[in-house]
């Protein structure tokens, strides 16, 4: 496999058609009728002008709209000298078909006891202890760490379930099904095709082992992340539409260090094109769950949660069988959510990288002796200091354009569309140390952050192969001709998705930027402070449990 125009895999021809469904949409508000009495609306182009001979018209316009996407086409020339014309015009046509939004689940930004996750920790601890007698040998932060660790188990189950469900989808009008989708999820398609029964067994064993622990179903935090990891979404309600989906970049592994309390550390998931097999996913799951199974406090907290919420109030994971499939859905608000996403880059895992920025590593921590035991997650985002990577953040230091379909937007529509948005408020480097990367501090984020995007298209050089592109919200077009062409080609592919993330283009030595590249509909300008308040409301809601002193 090759990445960024080097990762490839052989395509598979599909033979079964999938059905797409609409589960909801947005109604456009009535047009304003308050016009003057002399106003006249523009009229339509009347087809009757051309249809005096309807039978001949029908024969002349009979065209086959059946070209599958996921295939290479040469549109050819209609000039006298095709040889001469080919020097200037590339008539090859490839339509990209898959865009994957790679995300990391988070508890929201938290740097003291007043953050939403710490208020939620107090609420759930109060409720669980109210429903249980006796002395607890764990603190409220430990209980919240337990609940966050359970989220990663549920995401992993949804992730591998989607792999299995996608492997059974075929359609003659979209050659990206199912192979390209599996490649985007980091799995070896041939391994899934050849070992269906083993994959079904593994997915069910993940559900069974995760079901050994209790987590409250009232926390929609779990539902949100399971939904992200399960679904497929199309950019138009047609059979040849392009596909969007979500994939976890990393999950959180539970660790109990004793003296400093429990914490969650990163466990990286496969990237697009990694070609991981079933055995690799088995190792990942064992790594994720091993520290939970051997921890006494984890078992005690599970029992207390079970007693507090009851068997009917717990998260349940469904089994899979040979008929399990995931069908694509068209939903304008989900597309608006992807369109408003802003990528923060890969997690910073090396502690040495963060010298001069204490406490900003990608870990969810708590220490009873520090900050009154508050759960802390206040990471820095950044790259290795190269210009083209640093520029990916510059556009996100400004206020963002919130662009929505339709008109008359409700609070529910706005809050859903902003779930993947992140803004940055300051650029920082360690004093006097130019060798360190440029780091950016967030101005608030929600229950997940987008790390980057993966797009898959047909490779022009070898049309039976696929090309994997990884990109962010900024595209740099430098002076070098080869990079200039490659980045413009990438931009051309991205904007073929109707609701691709908004992009900014930076070019030349002066590093001037312009954008966004987007088809603006009904839009407004959103500030970092307003976005931070939205995220705070959402995190508070998604960790909801019965509360003693608040009347909703």
Swiss-Prot record:
Maturation and modification: The 7 kDa polypeptide is acetylated. Autocatalytic proteolysis releases a post-translationally modified peptide that remains associated with nucleic acid within the virion. This peptide is observed only when nucleic acid is packaged in the capsid.
Residue spans of biased composition, Basic residues class: 9-28
Signal peptide span: none
Additional remarks: Picobirnavirus particles are capable of disrupting biological membranes in vitro.
Function: The capsid protein self-assembles to form an icosahedral capsid with a T=2 symmetry made of 120 subunits.
InterPro entries: CP_picobirnavirus (IPR048835), CP_picobirnavirus_sf (IPR049178)
GO CC annotation, single: T=3 icosahedral viral capsid
Gene that specifies this protein: Segment-1
Keyword check for Acetylation: yes
Record keywords: Acetylation, Capsid protein, T=3 icosahedral capsid protein, Virion
Subunit comment: Homodimer.
Protein name, as recorded: Capsid protein precursor
Site (Cleavage): 65-66
Span list, region Disordered: 1-41
